[in-house]
Every structure is written in C-alpha cells, then in structure tokens.
A protein has these predicted regions:
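C-terminal helicase lobe and adjacent C-terminal extensions/tails of nucleic-acid helicase motors
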Residues: 96, 381, 439-446, 454, ...
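Conserved Walker A/P-loop ATP-binding site and its immediately adjacent core
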Residues: 256, 265-289, 301, 397
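SF2 helicase catalytic motif II
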Residues: 327, 331-335, 343-383, 388
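Inter-Walker segment of RecA-like/P-loop motor cores
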Residues: 290-339
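Conserved helicase motor
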Residues: 10-15, 275, 296-309, 456-459, ...
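Interdomain hinge/linker at the junction between the two RecA-like core domains of SF2 helicases
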Residues: 387, 393-446
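Walker A/P-loop
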Residues: 234-256
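Accessory nucleic-acid engagement/destabilization modules that flank
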Residues: 2-205
Length: 727
C-alpha cells in the first residue's frame, strides 16, 4: 500500500472544454525542482551544496497527513516549514535551517537557546519540533539524508548574515519559480539579450561620437576611453570621479558592459538616489540598448501586467527577481533589500552576485546609514563576486569604511586625472555674498531674465516665489505632485530654449538628474555637495564663458531647517580662507568635516553592531533589523491630490478598485507632508481619511478641498501651524 501512497506539494484546477479537473504536483518533483534551481543560483558564490540541500528539504513538512488533508480537503493550516528546518539542523547547519524555516514567513531572528518554546525566533520555533504543534512526517515519504559539512553557529558574524540572506534569496526565488512553472506553465522570464549583444549596440552608438569637434566633447571622449581601458582590470571596488557634464552616465555604462563581458558577469545594476534620475537615465539606456533590456524598478514605475488574460508582462516578472540584463533602481529599494527578511524583497538578492553595480551620485547615501550601506557594498564585492563602482562628481571619503568591510580590495579610480578634468570642465564662477533679505533676493532674481534659485525649505521657496512677477516665474517643490512637476519642467525647458524670461524658485529637488541649463544660479548655503549639484545646472553645456556664469551662494536671515545644520557647518569649515568650492580637495575636506561632525552616527540603528555582537540576547536579528532599517525616515504622510487625471484615479480608489497598479499610478498624484501639516489640514476639514475610505491606511488621506492646491505652488502651507516644513 505504501508504494501507492502519493504526497503532493501543490494542486491546480484545470478547465478542459467545460470539464473541471485537478492537476497535482508531486512533492518529490517540487523539492527536486527547487533543489536544482537553488543549487544553480547558489553556485554564483560557491554555496551550491547548501543551495541544493535547502531546496530538496524546504517542503519536507508537506509529507504529513495533516498537510495533505489541508491541501486536498481544505483542512486547517499546518506549519510545514519547521520539519525541513529540523532535517537541515541534523547537519548542524543552523543558519541554513533558518532559511528553510522562514521560506514563507520571512527570515526569523535567530534568537538564543534561552528562548521559550513558541517564541517567534528560530530557536523558539524549532523547540516546537516533537510537540503536537508540528505533525509527524509520514515514514512512507523517502526523505534523502542531508549531506552537508557542519556549520555551527558559535558567534555572530556580519559576513555570515549576508551569506544567509543570499542563500535565503536563492531558496525563495527557486521556490517561487518552480511553483509558478507548475501553476502557470512557462512564463516569459529571462527574455533580455546577452551582455555581448548589448555591448555591440553600445559600441555602435559610441562610434557615432568618434572625431569630436568641440573641446568638451574631446574631453568626454577621453573619459570614455579611460573607462573602456579600466574595464579590463580585475573585479573589485572602483570610483569614477567625473565632473558634472563629463558624460558619466554613458561612460559608466561602457565600463560596466566591457567589464561584465570581460569577466563573464551576469548583469549590470544601476543604483541611483532619486526616482527623477532613474526616469532620465532609463530613457538614455533604453535608447541605446532597447526597451526590453532595461528594467526600471522603483515605487513610481507601472507595469502593464495583463496576467488575468494570460499575458503576463515580462518586465513585471523581472521586477520580482531582477532577472534582466540591466536593472536601474533606487538606493532605498537596493539597500533596504540588502537588509530585508521578507521573501518578496529578498528574492532578487542572489542576482546581485557576479554583477557590476554602479552607485550613481554616491555622495547622496544618507550619512546616518553610511556604515551599513558601505558594509553591504563591501560584502557584495568581497563575498559574492560583484564589482562596485562609486560614481559621482563629488566623491565622498569612504576609504576607511571600504578597508573595514572589503579588506582584500583597495579602491581604484577609473579616471585618475581628476584635477585636470575638473579644471577643464569648470563652467561657472562662484560668488559668496553673505546674508540676503528675502526682498533683496527677489530683486536680484528679477534683474535676470533667466535664473534658478534653490532654497532649503519648501515654506521659504513658496514665500520667495510669491515676491516675483507672475509672468515667466515658476516654482518647483515636493509640495507639487510628480505629474505637476513634470508639466512645469516641460514649460521651463521650452522657455529656456526659446530664450524667454524664466525665473525658477525651487527646493533641492532640481539638483540631481534634472538637466536644465541656466545662465545664473543662486543657492542658499547648504552642504557643499548640494552647492556643486546646483552649480551643475549653470552653463551646463559650456556654451557661455565661465566668468559670465555666476553661482551665487547666500544665507537667508531665517535660520536654515535643523536638517541642514551639520552639512552647513561642514561647508563653512571647508570654504574657510576662500577655498575654491569646485576643487576636489575642498570636497574631500568637506566630507571629512561632515563625518567628524556626525561622529559615530553613521549607523543610526546599530545594524553592524547587531550582526557582529547580537542584539537583545539574540544572535542574527534578521527580522528586527529588517523592520527597523529605513533609508529615509518615514515621518511623513501621503496626501493624494485630485489634480487633473489624479481625480479619476482617486474616484477608482474610493470605489474599491485597489490594485498595485492603481497605487503606483496614484504615486504621480501624491504629496508627502509632515505630521503637523497633515494634522492642520485634517483640523481644517480638508482631508478624507481612512475612517471614510477603506482603501486608505492611517498614514494616507485624500485632499477634498482643492482650493488648498495651487496651480503654481502645489499644496498650501496656509493650514499649517507655523512650523517649518521642509522638502
């Protein structure tokens, strides 16, 4: 009888010519399939044996009468993960056992032997083994013995934590893919071209740039050549320090593709600080490499996924695990995934192994998380065969941290002639004017036909904008929804091109990745990196003389928001004795000062300490860190604005049409506000909240009084309580 006994992993209903039947996936087929895939994925970092065993044993707990009853007769829920974890534990490979235990519920905190039975840690849950809570395995299911060398957990280790998360990623992606193959048949995955093909396309585009005529284009060509020749160097950690306007987007792509092909690497990943930069870079890459080879993955992207009608979007599928030749994503998405514990977020991690990863605008990494960010970069290079390129015009000083987290890799500069290029690309003259009253500032701005003024706070930006004449004046800040900002930017570009008056007052959002070109820029005193980013919007194409392209640095009479305090302090020290703001040496001094002022606060929540020493008596606090590590403090709330097309999307939301795609589209019509501003709007009766609309959570609302959203300046701060809200 035992010979006929069948154990199933999954079932799926099939309708053939109106006749309903059920198809079954054998448990042994599923475990074998997952084992094979997981082995393949883990091979990228030499962990193929562990990958295979994790896959072959992850669903052992389905070989129980209780689980089969659940699957076939809709019986009660059953813990099917602990049994496989227990089997892996027999080889004393406890962290791999934790991967198996968390393959649905997330990688748990490891805990300690003192944890009571049933605690939500690995050690607490494994104690349930042998109690009635965990059904006994059916002796008729042939479970293969675990063949693994011992890997006991004796002490905490940061590198082991990264390795565990990588193995977890291999397991959950393999599990998703094998299950998907059974449930839905073959899906359009891995559809991009080879990196060799992409390199050929890039070469064809670059050949059009041969024989440059202008001085600037000759310099860009030299930088490009330096990138191509450096690509033959070994894998490791590189910096690419190129002045603004030096063509770093294309040059870094040339390095990445040449390097990846040279070393047989799997993909290229771009990590950028803002979604606004992503959209721009992604357009450049798509133009060169073809739309199907470029995956954008961030909160603002929408996929056309028509899976109900059997037409899954290959890009939506690729976004689940980054199985694409070129991925472009945000620093938030990237680093939060590196410290995540949920299967959906960790799925993609194994595809970072053996990849070229470009960190664009590397100076934008938040200082309070600098250490865990560099630790993640170090681990990818040191343990997982990746190459990292820190790419910026203002290189932060990271040597000491790189040495700590990637001790066998020294940083190497791709384009070593740094001072020479910075001199050649000098397109502006800096002028420091001290304190300016807002009225005096407005007068100065009015004296220019075309000028950009960047202010630290959203409130001050609105106030200064209100002092300018209506004709030809524009305002940009994050109090305007993204779709609105895009419309205004198009108007600004048109007026600049047509030589019409165009005065813009903006917050710092224009500093990175917005390619507008002004003859004059005013920048309120801020971090030196911000000032240089602002300067990059002045005489961008070098069509005017540097001495006629003035970047004016000023202070306002009102104190800057506290957020800017340390950066301004470091800038004051770095610019002492009339130092040249644009020289790489001044920049280095600035980052040294900033690190000094910040002291030990470069790991705000103690991520490194938690994995090197344990936390709260628990070794390997995967879940605790995942829940607490946020690149951007979410002390803001979302207000959806019924502006233009946003109104129809909000109607759909209120009618209950909730879907991922709808929330993504709504992101284009949302403003983030601080709690006090949210409360003031609520008190003024201007918000519809979760109490009235099920589709909202307690951190979001809909603006129902459109008189508070201005066509020029966005969401009004009039309802506020006098506090500075800054963006």
């Amino acid at each position: 009888i035992a010979m006929d006994k069948k154990f199933y992993a999954h079932t799926r209903p099939i309708n053939e010519n109106g006749v309903e039947r059920t198809e079954y996936q054998l448990l042994s087929d599923h475990e074998h399939g997952v084992g094979t895939l997981c082995r393949q994925f883990a091979e990228a970092f030499g962990a193929q044996a562990e990958g295979h065993e994790a896959g072959v044993h992850h669903d052992d707990g389905k070989a129980t009468a209780a689980f089969q009853h659940r699957l076939l007769d809709n019986g009660p829920k059953v813990d099917h993960a602990t049994a496989g974890a227990q089997n892996i534990m027999l080889s004393n490979n406890l962290l791999l056992a934790a991967c198996v235990m968390g393959h649905h519920s997330g990688l748990p905190d490891f805990g300690s032997t003192k944890d009571p039975l049933g605690a939500p840690t690995f050690t607490g849950r494994i104690k349930k083994w042998g109690t009635p809570a965990i059904p006994l395995l059916d002796p008729d299911y042939p479970i293969p013995p675990v063949r693994l060398p011992q890997r006991p957990v004796t002490k905490p280790s940061l590198s082991e934590s990264f390795r565990t998360r990588m193995l977890y990623s291999c397991l959950v992606d393999a599990d998703y893919l094998d299950t998907e193959r059974f449930m839905k048949g073959d899906m359009p995955r891995g559809t991009g071209d080879s990196l060799e093909t992409l390199l050929t396309r890039l070469q064809a585009r670059l050949n059009e740039w041969d024989n440059p005529t202008s001085e600037l284009n000759k310099l860009r060509q030299q930088i490009l050549r330096a990138c191509v020749s450096a690509a033959a160097n070994p894998k490791g950690i590189y910096t690419l320090t190129v002045p603004t306007g030096g063509g770093k987007t294309t040059s870094s792509l040339a390095f990445a593709l040449h390097h990846a092909v040279e070393h047989g690497m799997k993909r290229v990943i771009y990590v950028v600080p803002y979604t606004s930069i992503i959209e721009q870079n992604a357009d450049v890459f798509r133009g060169i490499l073809g739309n199907e080879n470029v995956l954008e993955h961030h909160s603002g992207v929408q996929f056309e996924n028509d899976e109900e009608n059997g037409n899954p979007d290959p890009k939506a599928l690729a976004a689940e695990n980054w199985d694409s030749p070129l991925v472009i994503t945000t620093a938030v998405q990237f680093f939060e995934s590196m410290y995540a514990n949920r299967s959906s977020q960790c799925r993609k991690l194994h595809n970072l192994a053996n990849s070229v990863i470009i960190f664009d605008e590397a100076q934008m990494l938040p200082l309070c998380h600098l250490m865990p960010c560099v630790a993640a970069i170090g681990a990818l290079v040191e343990q997982f065969g990746a190459t990292a390129v820190l790419c910026t015009a203002t290189q932060p000083v990271l040597g000491d941290l790189i040495q700590r987290f990637a001790p066998s890799h020294a940083i190497s500069e791709i384009c070593p002639e740094i001072p020479f290029y910075f001199d050649k690309f000098r397109r502006v003259t800096f002028r420091q004017v001290g304190v300016l009253e807002d009225d005096a500032l407005a007068e100065l701005l009015c004296a220019h036909e075309q000028v950009l003024c960047i202010i630290n706070s959203r409130k001050a930006a609105q106030s200064i904008f209100s002092k300018l004449p209506e004709e030809g004046s524009f305002h940009l800040s994050t109090l305007m929804v993204p779709a609105h900002r895009r419309t205004v930017l198009e108007q600004i570009r048109r007026r600049l091109n047509d030589g019409l008056p165009c005065r813009v007052v903006s917050t710092s959002l224009v500093e990175a990745g917005v390619d507008i070109d002004y003859p004059a820029v005013y920048r309120e005193l801020a971090g030196l990196d911000s000032i240089l980013q602002a300067a990059g919007r002045c005489n961008r194409e070098g069509k005017r003389a540097a001495e006629d392209s003035i970047v004016t640095i000023f202070r306002r009479t009102e104190k800057a928001p506290p957020l800017f305090g340390q950066a301004i302090g470091a800038t004051n020290i770095a610019l002492d004795n009339n130092a040249d703001p644009a020289s790489p040496q001044t920049m280095e001094n600035y980052f040294h000062e900033l690190r000094k002022l910040n002291g030990s606060a470069i790991d705000k929540i103690g991520v490194i300490d938690a994995f090197e020493r344990g936390r709260g008596g628990s070794l390997y606090p995967f879940r605790t860190i995942a829940e607490n590590f946020r690149m951007i403090d979410n002390d803001t709330r979302t207000v959806y604005i019924p502006w233009r097309e946003g109104a129809e999307l909000i109607d759909r939301l209120c009618a209950g049409a909730c879907s991922k795609s709808l929330y993504r589209q709504l992101g284009q019509y949302a403003v983030q506000v601080y709690d006090a501003h949210f409360q003031a709007l609520y008190d003024a009766g201007a918000l519809q909240t979760a109490d009235e609309t099920n589709a909202l959570d307690d951190r979001s609302a809909i603006l129902c009084d459109l008189s508070l959203y201005d066509e020029k300046t966005g969401l009004s701060l009039k309802a506020d309580s006098g506090q500075a809200f800054f963006g």
